[in-house]
Amino acid sequence: MEMVNKIACFVLLCMVVVAPHAEALTCGQVTSTLAPCLPYLMNRGPLGGCCGGVKGLLGQAQTTVDRQTACTCLKSAASSFTGLDLGKAASLPSTCSVNIPYKISPSTDCSKVQ
């Protein structure tokens, strides 16, 4: 029985050591996930696959740090794209029937996002 316990502990240790580490969300991921939204937000196309991107981002941003990163990236994008309809950006969560804990706006304080 003692040998079985040692083997079980060894197997568990190996699983912990080789388990993939969770990577933090990056602005590149946020941008690529929401790329289908750009034509819609610039009044150049339909909503299309945008909601799938919004829901995908919501699924990727599981931690407070990830949500703050996503917020910062969205805030930066909202400020840098000329011609972006900020009203559409702010209403995107409700349009796509998702709950994002912050407003997509250049004025959002991302440090307060939980």
From Swiss-Prot:
Residues 1-23 form the signal peptide. Keywords: Disulfide bond, Lipid-binding, Signal, Transport. GO terms for biological process: lipid transport. Plant non-specific lipid-transfer proteins transfer phospholipids as well as galactolipids across membranes. May play a role in wax or cutin deposition in the cell walls of expanding epidermal cells and certain secretory tissues. It comes from the Eukaryota. The keyword DNA-binding does not apply. Gene3D superfamilies: Plant lipid-transfer and hydrophobic proteins (1.10.110.10). Disulfide bonds join 27-73, 37-50, 51-96, 71-110. Belongs to the plant LTP family. InterPro entries: Bifun_inhib/LTP/seed_sf, Bifunc_inhib/LTP/seed_store, Plant_nsLTP. GO terms for molecular function: lipid binding. This is Non-specific lipid-transfer protein 2.
